């Protein structure tokens, strides 16, 4: 301890001494030693004053006219992330073969071959002697992440419209094309996977021409996997995609494209600078939350975070604050940021909207002791995904848990995978359900996300004017030979046909209005089964409609099992009721008394199964001729069972719920 105090005194004396006076020990502190004890803010300022690197000098020398911001529009699994890797290799951003799916950071993205979070990467490309700054934004392809897709498109000036040569145009290609078209992006047709034996580039080009009315003469045919013709894409990007419009002399205007959480830096924002410039030390304000932040660092993704002294109009990069933004809920996708004092000089960028949860599940730990771990795991994942809604709830059967809201079924499935892979959570998940709107006689409206809140008693039903459920406009693409089966599936799920179009001799685009509740009930799995995996699906919200929905309950010896209840359409009740009681019977152990399993809506029983009790042979020691004694013992056994059934609790193991709730 005495030695430590002496060292501290020596350091303190050294820092206070004049530089001319020699130090009392051999080690001489550098002139800027006081920075070792400086605050984070001064450290950020010091970072900003560092001399620019060779990379930064090249970037600063490039005018906005030689910027190109682009993304890749594609259906799931058409090779978007692989093509991104090839472009990064060709521009020298990464070493050839050094990584795969560089822009897919999550384990679940690499395993499923999908993109969940929007990512970006900056590339430098020399074309005809001039340096060009290319910003590639890798966007999710699935409908559940449409908010991230549309915000990413808003930060771009053009897009590569990527189509698989063997599969052709698919549902999400169509949906994402219209999103890109609505943003006014310049589209470059690209046919991928031309090296496959099943590839038919000519058919894919015809589909693009007839479906999107694009000039396919300039289309580029590539194989992202082998690198075939990918080098032709870079000159095409430079020549066909326009430069971003912006002025670095105007007041700062920044679009928030995405965000992620860092343990040390807090929330890091992915931004597109539309006007002005931003650097460390600037104070920014959010139009959505009105909160103010001091910039700690700005930089580009090259492909990892690479600090820069400034981000100028037209650039896509990252920013984090000091002190850091601690809550990801403050980072709202589509929000506009500007410098403090410029709020009245800048109009917020259009298109900002809060993401709405449309699919809800309940999550419970398999063991009650794991609840704190589950809560901590969910909170950590929420740091990177602000679109999930969380509410604590309790079930008599399963204990404490959470009601979670997601953008869609894939979003829910990805979240569940991340809970298990990244945090080792062992959980029970209820089947997905959708919100229900209640219009009361008083004129009020209530959106119900949990079956517990559904007004199913007679007194409550009297106060209800009507129930409504959400509908979606569904776009399905598939080979024409499956048309009859697909129409039958849609009609069987309460669908209403909107349009039918043959966009090639063999492919059909079918549009249906469907209840969202039917869509989340494994509709896509049934569609894939009917079409042997050749169908694709996309959907968009289509408002609320009046509906005859009821709360279906599961009763065990007349006691409701709250964790299993669901709000369903009246037409599904007979099928689901019978399915429930039959399946639940398989997983409940026999008891010493009779167990009655029932499915009910209100006071009406719609299905029933019975589990017989264990039978004790009370007549084993009796003589065959003792009839009165026989009757007496059987009557006493019968009364005992009734009494046991009245006071006994049915023991239902967690594994029974796990098996029942699994598909």
Swiss-Prot record:
Give the matching InterPro entries.
EF-4, EFG_III/V, EFG_V-like, EFTu-like_2, G_TR_CS, LepA_C_sf, LepA_CTD, LepA_IV
User: SUPFAM superfamilies, per this entry?
Assistant: EF-G C-terminal domain-like, P-loop containing nucleoside triphosphate hydrolases, Translation proteins
Query: How does the record classify its membrane topology?
Result: Peripheral membrane protein
Residues recorded as binding GTP, renumbered to this chain, are: 74-81, 138-142, 192-195
Q: Which domain of life is it from?
A: Eukaryota
HAMAP family linked to this entry: LepA (MF_00071)
* Subcellular locations according to the entry: Mitochondrion inner membrane
Question: What reaction is this protein's catalytic activity?
Answer: GTP + H2O = GDP + phosphate + H(+)
Q: Into which family does the record put it? A: Belongs to the TRAFAC class translation factor GTPase superfamily. Classic translation factor GTPase family. LepA subfamily.
> What is the protein name stated in its UniProt record?
Translation factor GUF1, mitochondrial
Residue span, tr-type G domain: 65-245
Query: Taxonomically, what lineage is the organism?
Result: Eukaryota, Fungi, Dikarya, Ascomycota, Pezizomycotina
Q: Name one GO biological process term.
A: positive regulation of translation
What are the record's GO terms for cellular component? mitochondrial inner membrane; mitochondrial matrix
What is the extent of the transit peptide?
Answer: 1-37
Q: Which UniProt keywords apply?
A: GTP-binding, Hydrolase, Membrane, Mitochondrion, Mitochondrion inner membrane, Nucleotide-binding, Protein biosynthesis, Transit peptide
Query: Briefly, what is this protein's role?
Result: Promotes mitochondrial protein synthesis. May act as a fidelity factor of the translation reaction, by catalyzing a one-codon backward translocation of tRNAs on improperly translocated ribosomes. Binds to mitochondrial ribosomes in a GTP-dependent manner.
Under which EC number(s) is this enzyme classified?
Answer: 3.6.5.-
Instruction: Work out whether the entry's keyword set contains GTP-binding.
Output: yes
| Gene Ontology MF terms | GTP binding; GTPase activity; mitochondrial ribosome binding
């Amino acid at each position: 301890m005495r030695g430590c105090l002496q060292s501290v005194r020596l350091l303190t004396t050294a820092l206070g001494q004049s530089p001319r006076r020699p130090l009392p020990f051999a080690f001489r502190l550098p002139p800027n030693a006081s920075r070792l004890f400086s605050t984070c803010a001064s450290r950020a300022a010091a970072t900003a004053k560092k001399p620019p690197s060779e990379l930064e000098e090249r970037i600063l020398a490039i005018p906005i006219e030689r910027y190109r911001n682009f993304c890749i529009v594609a259906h799931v699994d058409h090779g978007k992330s692989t093509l991104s890797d090839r472009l990064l290799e060709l521009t020298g951003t990464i070493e050839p073969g050094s990584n795969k799916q560089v822009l897919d950071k999550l384990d679940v993205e690499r395993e499923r071959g999908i993109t969940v979070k929007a990512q970006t990467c900056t590339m430098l490309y020399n074309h005809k002697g001039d340096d060009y700054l290319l910003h590639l934004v890798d966007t999710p392809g699935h409908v559940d992440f449409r908010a991230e897709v549309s915000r990413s498109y808003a930060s771009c000036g053009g897009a590569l419209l990527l189509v698989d040569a063997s599969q052709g145009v698919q549902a999400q290609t169509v949906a994402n094309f219209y999103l890109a078209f609505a943003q006014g992006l310049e589209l470059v047709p690209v046919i991928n996977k031309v090296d496959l034996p099943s590839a038919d580039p000519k058919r894919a080009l015809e589909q693009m021409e007839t479906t999107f009315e694009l000039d396919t003469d300039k289309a580029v045919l590539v194989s992202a996997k082998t690198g075939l013709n990918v080098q032709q894409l870079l000159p095409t990007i430079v020549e066909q995609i326009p430069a971003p419009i912006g002025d670095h002399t105007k007041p700062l205007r920044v679009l928030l494209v995405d965000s992620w959480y860092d343990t040390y830096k807090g929330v890091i924002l992915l931004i597109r600078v539309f006007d002005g410039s931003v650097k460390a030390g600037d104070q920014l304000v959010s139009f959505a939350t009105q909160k103010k932040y001091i910039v700690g660092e700005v930089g580009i993704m090259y492909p990892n975070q690479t600090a820069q002294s400034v981000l100028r109009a037209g650039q896509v990069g990252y920013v984090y604050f000091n002190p850091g933004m601690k809550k990801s809920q403050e980072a709202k996708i589509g929000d506009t940021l500007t410098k403090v004092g410029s709020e009245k000089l800048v109009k917020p960028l259009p298109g900002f909207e809060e993401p709405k949860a449309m699919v809800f599940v309940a999550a419970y730990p398999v063991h009650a002791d794991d609840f704190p771990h589950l809560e901590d795991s969910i909170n950590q994942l929420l740091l990177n995904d602000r679109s999930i809604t969380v509410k604590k709830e309790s079930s008599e059967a399963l204990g404490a848990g959470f009601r979670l809201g997601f953008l869609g079924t894939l979003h829910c499935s990805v979240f569940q995978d991340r809970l298990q892979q990244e945090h080792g959570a062992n959980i029970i998940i209820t089947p997905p359900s959708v919100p229900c709107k209640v219009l009361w006689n008083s004129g009020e409206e209530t959106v119900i996300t949990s079956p517990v809140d559904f007004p199913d008693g007679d007194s409550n039903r009297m106060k209800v004017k009507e129930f409504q459920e959400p509908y979606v406009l569904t776009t399905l693409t598939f080979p024409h030979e499956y048309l009859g089966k697909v129409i039958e599936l849609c009609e069987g799920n309460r669908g209403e046909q909107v349009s039918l179009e043959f966009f090639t001799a063999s492919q059909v685009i079918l549009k249906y209005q469907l209840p969202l509740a039917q869509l989340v009930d494994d509709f896509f799995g049934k569609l894939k089964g009917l079409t042997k995996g050749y169908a694709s699906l996309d959907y968009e919200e289509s408002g609320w409609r009046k509906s005859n929905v009821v709360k279906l309950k599961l009763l065990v010896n007349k006691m409701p099992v709250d964790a299993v209840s669901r709000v369903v359409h009246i037409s599904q009740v007979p099928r689901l009721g019978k399915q429930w009681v039959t399946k639940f019977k398989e997983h409940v152990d026999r008891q010493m008394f009779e167990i009655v399993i029932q499915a009910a809506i209100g006071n009406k029983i719609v299905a029933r199964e019975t589990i017989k009790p264990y039978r004790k042979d009370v007549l084993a020691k009796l003589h065959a001729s003792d009839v009165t004694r026989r009757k007496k013992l059987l009557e006493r056994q019968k009364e005992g069972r009734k009494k046991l059934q009245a006071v006994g609790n049915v023991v239902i193991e967690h594994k029974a719920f796990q098996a029942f709730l699994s598909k």
